[in-house]
Every structure is written in C-alpha cells, then in structure tokens.
C-alpha cells in the first residue's frame, strides 16, 4: 500500500425421467444402467474442501518481503477532537513494527509507537516521557488477545490464530468460511472463535484480499469491546497486490 491510514451457491437438482415402452396393455420398466447413472448424477458438494480452497487463496496473498516502509496518516481522538499528524510506518517481519509520528512540514519525530515480540514502547518526545511494557500489561491488547504476531498479521493483511506465530496449511481447517453473502454484499466471511474472542475477516472474493478484520472480546464484567481494522486502495508490491 502506498499510504496507510490508521483509525483508533445454490445448486439445482437434475431430474432424470425415463419412459417405458408400451406394448398392448403391458408396460415395461426400463432397466437403469447404474454405471451411466453414476456418471450423470451431480457430485455432492464438499463444503469443507471449498472452505480450504478459499483459505488457501487468502493465505497465498501473504507478502514475502522482509522489510516494509510506508508514509502514514495517524489520527487520534482525545475525547474532544481529532488530532491528525503525518508519520512513517517501518516494519521488519517477525521483529518489529514502528510508527513514527512527525511534526507537519518539519517532519521531526514527536512520538513513537513500537511493537516488538516481547514489549510495547510508547515515546512522547514533547513531554519527554516514555512507557515500555509487556503485552500482558497493556489492558486493551491483553483483553483482546492481541500479541506481536496478531498485530503483525493485522498490518500485513493476513489471518491469524491467537498465541501462534504463524498459520500453517494444517491450521487452515480451523477457520469457518461463509460464502453465502459473497454475491449480495461482495465479501466472503471468514471466522474463528477462541474462548471469549471472536475473530472475523471480510474478504473480497475476486482478489482474495482481506478488506476488514474485526476482533471482538466478550467480557462478563465489561461487556463487548471491538477492534476494527479496514483496508483499501491496494497497490502492487513486487509480484503481489
């Protein structure tokens, strides 16, 4: 993506009819050729296999690049108004995700948000403050089952399984695929449930690109909290779109 914006089948049955040959008052029933019948009967629909095909197509869209750098627009709502600043997104796969927030025009760094495998770092250069914590110490991330690899999948437009570094081909069967709304709403729904967590991905059935990721945490005490992550304006990058 050239620029990143961050915001806090129905089957119809085939009927075969056959007519017997009439001779006087005697009606003969034709002998059905089982071999022919087996060849002409429609094959049963394998929903599980179709789901795996969809998941494989989505997984195949994963970028193979190790490093990514992109300009971004960062918008934060402080409860009264939106504050928007330019920035730079730098990512090194399986190592770090760094968001640098810049002063407009001058483009000097005023803040930084950094996600590494075992910590989260927030730097406020204006007030000369910083916070470094583990993922378990950040309530929003902990409550929504988000760790470094989950965040990396969000940034890299991929599906993920909580607490796992990667999604292997053997893992694809864990996801549920619903293609019933692909024609009406233009998206295929992929879902995964993990305890109190619900993960959903809306996928463009033509490009097999994820266009929306939704993570919902259902708490007995605080109700439901939701994280929505949308994607658009895809650009070619290497041999991938």
Predicted regions and their residues:
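Gly/Pro-enriched, hydrophobic low-complexity segments
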Residues: 21-25, 164-241
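Solvent-exposed loop/turn segments connecting transmembrane beta-strands
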Residues: 78-82, 102-110, 195-197, 221-224
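Bacterial N-terminal signal peptides that target proteins for export
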Residues: 1-8
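Edge/loop elements at the starts and ends of beta-strands within beta-rich repeat scaffolds
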Residues: 60-68, 78-83, 90-95, 113, ...
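N-terminal leader/targeting segments and the immediate start of mature chains
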Residues: 20-81
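C-terminal motif of bacterial Sec signal peptides marking the signal peptidase cleavage site
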Residues: 15-18
């Amino acid at each position: 993506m050239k620029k990143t914006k961050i915001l806090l089948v129905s089957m119809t049955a085939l009927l075969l009819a056959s007519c017997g040959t009439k001779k006087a008052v005697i009606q003969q029933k034709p002998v059905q050729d089982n071999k022919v019948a087996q060849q002409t009967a429609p094959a049963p629909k394998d929903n599980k296999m179709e789901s795996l095909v969809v998941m494989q197509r989505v997984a195949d869209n994963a970028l193979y690049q190790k490093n990514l750098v992109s300009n971004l627009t960062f918008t934060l709502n402080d409860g009264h108004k939106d504050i928007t600043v330019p920035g730079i997104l730098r990512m090194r796969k399986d190592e770090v995700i760094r968001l640098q927030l810049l002063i407009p025009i001058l483009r000097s760094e005023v803040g930084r948000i950094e996600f590494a495998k075992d910590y989260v770092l927030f730097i406020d250069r204006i007030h000369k403050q910083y916070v470094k914590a583990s993922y378990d110490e950040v309530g929003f991330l902990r409550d929504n089952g988000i760790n470094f690899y989950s965040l990396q999948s969000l940034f890299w437009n991929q599906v993920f399984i909580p607490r796992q570094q990667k999604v292997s081909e053997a893992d694809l069967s864990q996801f549920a695929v619903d293609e019933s709304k692909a024609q009406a709403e233009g998206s295929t729904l992929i879902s995964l449930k993990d305890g109190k967590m619900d993960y959903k991905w809306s996928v463009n059935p033509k490009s097999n690109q994820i266009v929306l990721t939704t993570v919902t945490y259902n708490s007995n005490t605080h109700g439901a909290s939701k994280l929505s992550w949308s994607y658009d304006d895809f650009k070619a990058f290497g041999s991938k779109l």
